[in-house]
Amino acid sequence: MENIHDLWERALKSMEKKVSKPSFETWLKQTKANSIEDSTIIITAPNEFARDWLEKHYDELISETIDDLTGVRLYPKFVIPTSQLDEPFVEQELKKPMKQPPAQNGEMPNNMLNDKYTFDTFVIGSGNRFAHAASLAVAEAPAKAYNPLFIYGGVGLGKTHLMHAIGHYVMDHNPNAKVVYLSSEKFTNEFINAIRDNKAVNFRNKYRNVDVLLIDDIQFLAGKEQTQEEFFHTFNALHEDNKQIVISSDRPPKEIPTLEDRLRSRFEWGLITDITPPDLETRIAILRKKAKAENLDIPNEVMLYIANQIDTNIRELEGALIRVVAYSSLINQDMNADLAAEALKDIIPNAKPRVLTITDIQKTVGEYFHVKLEDFKAKKRTKSVAFPRQIAMYLSRELTDASLPKIGSEFGGRDHTTVIHAHEKISKLLSTDQELQDKIQDISDKLRS
């Protein structure tokens, strides 16, 4: 018998390691497990929006996490708070669920592939292009292209995505293929249990009779001599039988401490490729693909802001997008760069200065001079519009990296010579007009605040 509150605390701690910090803080941290009914665990979400998002995106993660912790497959049902849910947690004995997930590949273990991780959903950029090409080559011709394929890189950069994509591709083109994905930690735990229960032969048969073995985070084998010994023989058996091995790590083989030299040398038999953090263009592409996949309408300025602020890895990037979407929905305000900055202030306390856009400048100048945004793009030449428009063009030239043609296009498709004229005119006036200097300074301060 296990207290459900304690179980959920353990589950949350486990899931915190599996998702980005923004995703955990936004969606999982505020949940509570209320009860267990047959094979269902009742989980309280803070509001309807969070409940709907959890149902769509986190039910499988929760089910797998509880299964890993207890050996019991429970299926989450999300509810919102009611007076009944405020009652104290009740201790319940975990019972075996009524329905079991279907077995895959006959007697083989569940391949544990994530349906969302395919080559189609992978965003290619300069930092992962080679790793993607190598992974696709391996998927198209297992054990004939590169064997083993060793992919390394930092957390959340797409190593696991590529491994799952290889598995999906192989099974799509050969449904009878025996494909297994697992972490080195799970390999270690199963090996220890097999030794304890005198089932070493079963363990060896399980992982030496596959067509493709995808093993994640191999660096965790470091220092585990017996497990390294077992994996060494598993590797040899598969390689000699012309079966594909794909390995991932957070560092190249030569930098994994206390890894046996014989394993290190075998990891170097095939191809070693790395993945580096995505550049700005790739980060924007990742956000656009995520938004499209989730049917979200995200303004370009929001995606640009997030991409400029989050340059570490894909998990944090997508987590930040989800947090902004949630924040916008919960406070019932349209998304813009300012709202994004507010939503992300807790996770990027030392945020980089927001990249100003021409639209930002037009809005601020328009508010200052009481000019409508559309008037900046119209053909109006009255002084009440033309002069603020010239100031906005001047500031766009001074405060952004936009080209002259780009600035002109943002002001109703005007020619770049018009932008040059506006910049020269305002620059000349500023040399003698103290009042204009004060106005420009005031507007600039508002833009930078």
Swiss-Prot record:
Give the residue ranges for region: Domain I, interacts with DnaA modulators. Answer: 1-72
Q: Give the span(s) annotated as Domain IV, binds dsDNA.
A: 329-449
Location of region: Domain II:
72-111
Keyword list (alphabetical) reads: ATP-binding, Cytoplasm, DNA replication, DNA-binding, Lipid-binding, Nucleotide-binding
Where are the residues of the annotated region Domain III, AAA+ region? 112-328
Record-annotated residues binding ATP? G156, G158, K159, T160
Q: CDD domains recorded for this chain? A: AAA (cd00009), Bac_DnaA_C (cd06571)
Give the GO molecular function terms: ATP binding; ATP hydrolysis activity; DNA replication origin binding; lipid binding
- Would the keyword DNA repair turn up in this protein's UniProt record? no
Q: Which is a Gene Ontology cellular component entry for this protein?
A: cytoplasm
| InterPro entries per the UniProt record, alphabetical | AAA+_ATPase, Chromosome_initiator_DnaA, Chromosome_initiator_DnaA-like, Chromosome_initiator_DnaA_CS, DnaA_C, DnaA_dom, DnaA_N_dom, DnaA_N_sf
- Lipoprotein recorded as keyword: no
Location of the protein in the cell = Cytoplasm
Q: Which GO terms describe its biological process?
A: DNA replication initiation; regulation of DNA replication
| Source organism superkingdom | Bacteria
Q: What is known of its domains?
A: Domain I is involved in oligomerization and binding regulators, domain II is flexibile and of varying length in different bacteria, domain III forms the AAA+ region, while domain IV binds dsDNA.
**Record's subunit section:** Oligomerizes as a right-handed, spiral filament on DNA at oriC.
The record's listing under PANTHER family reads:
CHROMOSOMAL REPLICATION INITIATOR PROTEIN DNAA (PTHR30050:SF2)
State the similarity comment. Belongs to the DnaA family.
HAMAP family, per the entry: DnaA_bact (MF_00377)
* Record's function text: Plays an essential role in the initiation and regulation of chromosomal replication. ATP-DnaA binds to the origin of replication (oriC) to initiate formation of the DNA replication initiation complex once per cell cycle. Binds the DnaA box (a 9 base pair repeat at the origin) and separates the double-stranded (ds)DNA. Forms a right-handed helical filament on oriC DNA; dsDNA binds to the exterior of the filament while single-stranded (ss)DNA is stabiized in the filament's interior.
Name the chain's protein.
Chromosomal replication initiator protein DnaA
